[in-house]
Amino acid sequence: MKFNVANPTTGCQKKLEIDDDQKLRAFFDKRLSQEVSGDALGEEFKGYVFKIMGGCDKQGFPMKQGVLTPGRVRLLLHRGTPCFRGHGRRTGERRRKSVRGCIVSPDLSVLNLVIVKKGVSDLPGLTDTEKPRMRGPKRASKIRKLFNLGKEDDVRKYVNTYRRTFTNKKGKKVSKAPKIQRLVTPLTLQRKRARIADKKKRIAKANSDAADYQKLLASRLKEQRDRRSESLAKKRSRLSSAPAKPVAA
C-alpha cells in the first residue's frame, strides 16, 4: 500500500510504499479523520501520530466520509458533494456513483495521511526541510488577520514579505506579489463618493423630469377640456339659433 504523508507545518509531502501486512494492520478498520500511532510502521516513525484524511482503491474510487462500510457502494450524489464533480450536469441533477466507505480495508492502494504530532527523529523530506508557501493571501482582511493589523495600518507594506523573486524565460530577474483585493484607499473612497453623488444627481434629475412631465400633461389635458367645452358651447348655440321646422298637417 502507498502512503501519501503530508506535513502542514513545513508544507512538505512524501510518498511511502509499505508492503508488510504486519505494519499495515494498525491502519485496518480505522475510519477517516481518526488518528493512528506511527510506531507500527517502524523505528523511524516512533512517536509520530498520523490522521487519516482519505484514500483510493485499486480501481481509483475514493473514500467518502459518513459511509460506514469497508467496501464499495453506489450512492445517488448531486453536484457539490465530495466524490462527485458534476460538471456539465443540469441544475439539481443527481447521478449514482461508486464510492468506497470511510473504513480502511486491505483493498486500498493509496492512503492519505497528515502528521498531527512529530516524533523523536526527523523524516527526510518531511520534517527536516521547510517549503515556504508560494502564495500568500490576496484579500485585505485576510492579510490583516495574518499579520494582526488594525484598520489604520497600511496593508501594502506587508505584501512584500511574501513577494517572490524569480528569473523569467528571457533571463531577467522579476519580482512578483499578489494584487491586494478589497483594499480601501483614498482613491477608492473618492470613487465611491463620486458614484453616490452621481446616483443622487440622476435621482434628482429623474424626479424633476417626472414633475415637468406631470405639469405638461396637466396643461395639455386642461387645453383639451377647454377645446371640448368650447366646441360643445358652439354646437348648443348653433342648435338654439336654428329656426324651428314647420309641422306637417
From Swiss-Prot:
Give the CC-aspect GO terms: cytosolic ribosome; cytosolic small ribosomal subunit; plasma membrane; plasmodesma
Q: Which UniProt keywords apply?
A: Phosphoprotein, Ribonucleoprotein, Ribosomal protein
Task: Quote one Gene Ontology molecular function term.
Answer: structural constituent of ribosome
Q: Does the keyword Phosphoprotein apply?
A: yes
Give the transmembrane region(s): none
Q: Where is the composition biased (Basic and acidic residues)?
A: 220-233
Modification after translation: Ribosomal protein S6 is the major substrate of protein kinases in eukaryote ribosomes.
Keyword Phosphoprotein assigned to the entry: answer is yes
Q: Return the annotated region ranges for Disordered.
A: 219-249
Q: Which residues carry this modification: Phosphoserine?
A: 237
Give one Pfam family, short name only.
Ribosomal_S6e
Q: Which GO terms describe its biological process?
A: translation
Where does the UniProt annotation place the signal sequence?
A: none
Job of this protein: Component of the 40S small ribosomal subunit. Plays an important role in controlling cell growth and proliferation through the selective translation of particular classes of mRNA.
The similarity annotation says: Belongs to the eukaryotic ribosomal protein eS6 family.
Q: What is this protein identified as?
A: Small ribosomal subunit protein eS6y
Lineage of producing organism: Eukaryota, Viridiplantae, Streptophyta, Embryophyta, Tracheophyta
